[in-house]
UniProtKB/Swiss-Prot annotation:
Interacts with gI. This is Envelope glycoprotein E. Phosphorylated on serines within the acidic cluster. Phosphorylation determines whether endocytosed viral gE traffics to the trans-Golgi network or recycles to the cell membrane. It comes from Cercopithecine herpesvirus 1 (strain E2490) (CeHV-1). Residues 1-24 form the signal peptide. In epithelial cells, the heterodimer gE/gI is required for the cell-to-cell spread of the virus, by sorting nascent virions to cell junctions. Once the virus reaches the cell junctions, virus particles can spread to adjacent cells extremely rapidly through interactions with cellular receptors that accumulate at these junctions. Implicated in basolateral spread in polarized cells. In neuronal cells, gE/gI is essential for the anterograde spread of the infection throughout the host nervous system. Residues 432-539 are intravirion.
């Protein structure tokens, strides 16, 4: 195919996909066929009298990887429901443009004569018979979603007709028998030789949103400017409430710098929903990764809103970081950069929160042409970069650190030992001081003071006895007194008080009397206390 033809075909494919999204009317049917059958797909609409030629597009979306498809009830605008099919976008192959043409009349006939394909060549197995688009010699590869879009100028509203076609391999017919009859259904569609399931089996339960809020966000992905220009974003946010519960919607703008050393910026979508992940906080490809932001550039808040009063009709407020040239573009959720410079450029991400949860997001790169970097969306989390280890292995202690409870017990034991030692020293000091005072008191005793040396010979308290009338006793004689002693008092305690000099038996005065009885020197140790060398003092 020539390059201009390829370009035209690419435009037609994009135009056909857009038609599938923006169609005004949708009609969906299901057909089953066997390989080699002729399948009547669409009945071409009649031309409008006096209307410009309509544009017709026939495309095929292969769905061989989607498994078995069946009808289901889908809630597009609750509580209304339509019978349709829910298909995972990941299993749908690239659309194939089968034909596209403008209607034209032959001899004033109201039946359109199609002008096949961009190069005027009709498809090999497609044909229009009596106003019906027919697929001849169906194959297993023709299974999928066939879409016929008819655009009527001048407003280019499209009517879409969708047929889910399932082509099964033909089974060999039994020998010697007649094949089962084929019933024409839906305009003569031929059924396979074997009985096929009904075109409308029992629909499954609802699979679309029936509660909550669905948010649709559309934006361009790049804005180029020259220094000094005034530019603004073009983001469209459309919330659809599926119930009457109130909700709060926040449109948050964040900005990431685009370093010159980065070949491209990577946006990790899981980090928008789970910013607390360790790999999001420390990505391996930082600073070329847009994973977690620390501050919000601008926020516009709507709420409380409801299905009857959606944004922007519900109450709203806005907040924005103070930056030169940054402002809101009117009363919308878009940003405006006045007198933009290279410092104003960067990766801008718009995130829509509903009741604190992420519901939609988009991004746009605002930059000059010389510093433009592409942004790539990654569906998986980034690789984790461990934080650097600050201390070196040699600086770490070799042995294990003692546990805190063991250290506390050791401190307690040492404290108790010190306390016992202090108490013992205190007791020892007190005893030593007491003994020293007692010894000093004995050393200071005056030997000349009166001292008791012996008991009296008379009966103690003799004046109170029955013999108290007698003046003298047989024991009161001068011969019984020690030399140098005074006679004992007649009516006293019975003790003899001696002077210091006289009381000493070994003194010179006592030795003058020959009848003094003394103890031998070798016997004195038996009668004296060795621990008390001095005589007892006066009581």
């Amino acid at each position: 195919m020539r390059p201009p033809v390829r370009a035209s075909l690419g435009l037609l494919v994009a135009w056909a996909i857009g038609a599938c999204v923006c169609a005004a009317a949708i009609e969906t049917t299901w057909k089953h066929a066997s390989a080699g059958d002729e399948v009547r797909l669409f009945a071409l609409p009649a031309a409008r009298p006096g209307a410009p030629p309509a544009k017709v597009v026939w495309e095929l979306d292969p769905m061989a990887a989607c498994g078995s498809l069946r009808p289901s009830w889908v809630s597009l605008r609750p509580p209304g429901q339509v019978l349709d099919t829910v298909v995972d976008a990941e299993c749908v192959s690239e659309p194939v443009l089968l034909a596209a043409w403008y209607e034209r009349r032959d001899g004033g006939s109201e039946v359109p004569a199609p002008f096949w394909g961009p190069d005027g060549a009709p498809p090999q197995r497609g044909n229009v018979t009596n106003g019906t688009l027919v697929l001849r010699e169906a194959r297993v590869g023709d299974s999928g979603m066939h879409v016929l879009s008819v655009f009527h100028p001048p407003n280019a509203t499209a009517a879409r007709h969708v047929v889910f076609l399932k082509v099964a391999p033909r089974r060999p017919e039994p020998a010697g028998g007649t094949p089962p009859p084929r019933d024409d259904e839906e305009g003569g569609t031929e059924e396979p030789a074997t009985p096929a399931p009904p075109p409308h089996p029992h629909p499954i339960a609802e699979v679309a949103h029936v509660r909550g809020v669905t948010v649709s966000l559309r934006t361009q992905t790049a804005i180029l400017f020259a220094p000094g220009d005034t530019v603004h974003t073009d983001v469209s946010v459309m919330p659809i409430a599926h119930d009457d519960d109130p909700y709060v919607m926040e449109v948050v703008w964040v900005r990431f710098d685009v370093p010159e050393e980065c070949g491209e910026m990577r946006i990790y979508e899981p980090c928008l929903y789970h910013p607390q992940l360790p790999e999001c906080r420390s990505p391996a490809d930082a600073p070329c990764a847009a994973s977690v932001w620390t501050e919000r550039l601008a926020v516009r808040r709507y709420g409380p809103c409801s299905r009857g009063v959606p944004p922007p009709r519900c109450p709203s407020d806005a907040a924005m970081e103070s930056r030169a040239g940054l402002g809101w573009y009117g009363h919308t959720v878009n940003l405006q950069l006045r007198d933009a410079s290279e410092a104003s450029g960067g990766l801008y991400v718009c995130v829509v929160y509903v009741n604190g949860h992420v519901h939609a997001w988009g991004h746009v790169v605002i930059s000059t042409a010389s510093r433009y970097r592409n942004a790539v969306v990654e569906r998986s989390p980034p690789r984790y970069r461990p934080p650097p280890v600050e201390p070196t292995p040699s600086a770490q202690p070799t042995g294990p650190r003692p546990a805190a409870p063991r250290a506390a017990r050791l401190v307690g034991v040492l404290g108790a030992a010190v306390g016992l030692a202090v108490a013992g020293l205190s007791v020892w000091a007190c005893v030593t001081c007491r003994r020293a005072r007692a010894w000093r008191a004995v050393k200071r005793r005056d030997l000349m003071a009166p001292t008791y040396i012996r008991l009296a010979d008379d009966e103690l308290y003799g004046d109170l006895s029955s013999y108290g009338d007698s003046d003298d006793s047989e024991y009161d004689s001068d011969s019984d007194r020690l030399p140098g002693t005074d006679p004992a008092p007649k009516r006293g305690s019975g003790f003899q008080i001696l002077s210091g000099a006289k009381a000493d038996p070994w003194s010179a005065g006592a030795r003058q009397h020959g009848h003094l009885i003394t103890f031998r020197a070798d016997d004195t140790s038996r009668y004296r206390d060795p621990s008390s060398p001095d005589p007892p003092h006066r009581r």
